[in-house]
Amino acid sequence: RHAANRYYTHLFLGPVSSAVMLGGRTDFFLWRPLFVDYSYNFTARNYKNGNFGNLTSVSNTESMKFLENFLSLGFGFPVTHRSAFVIRLNGGQERYYYSLDRASYKENYYEDLTTLNYISPKIELRRSSLDRMIFPHSGTSLSLSGIYLYGRDRFVPSPYSRDEQRLRKSKRDVSWWGARIVWNQYFQISGSKWFSLGYGAEAVVTTIPTLSNDKVTRMLMPAYRPTLHSQTVYMPEYRAKRYAAVSVMPTFDFSDRFFLRTGIYAMFAERFRPTDDRMRYIVDASLVYHT
């Protein structure tokens, strides 16, 4: 039995990241409530000015530009009042612009290109009782997901790479599996109206192979980006084939809507290079007001 249709358009424009999403969702009832969602997604991220927003210079970011176009089709149903199981199929193209020769560049003469055309099924079981999607103050969330990706990796070197390093165009088929678990909880400290706490854990395992070069292989690895600011820069050290991470988020409450959220995040990652550190840390503080 048909229940409802919903259509939407999302547009986000920013100096580092821009995105467009056109889609819809159909809810219906057979033996239980079911839904189908469908969307076209375009994302552009420009990390060529990779230190955007930093108050001081840093050395752990790299210049990179990323474009993605893909179609998504999902089918799911509720498991409980607050949880759902979703099967999804994504297919599209990712384009990575970067330089094999230098971490920071501005001239297109140094810009190498890797294109990945792919199709990727995904399954996910998610549960959430969070009071807000961004900067939640109470509740728990849990996500268990697994993916398979099959695609073609195509590398086009820049004029500099062709002239000085004698690199050539290349194509190859690639495939891999991956699994991720993410859990977070937020709660009020008993007996204290001024202080609350959040903590979380995340673990990822993949079988990503070596692609056309080490730089783009790392770009395609899962990233640990627990804060909003960490999502606006490209930091290779926080990408890994396999990793585990934990977080603690003390919160100082001035009112129900106004609070200071702090966070300490630690990531234990598989080494990509012998010189890589296994432990990585992020410290964050955000002054939050919810309207």
Region locations from a protein language model:
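Outer-membrane beta-barrel translocator domains and adjoining extracellular loop/strand segments
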Residues: 21-25, 48-57, 97-106, 136-138, ...
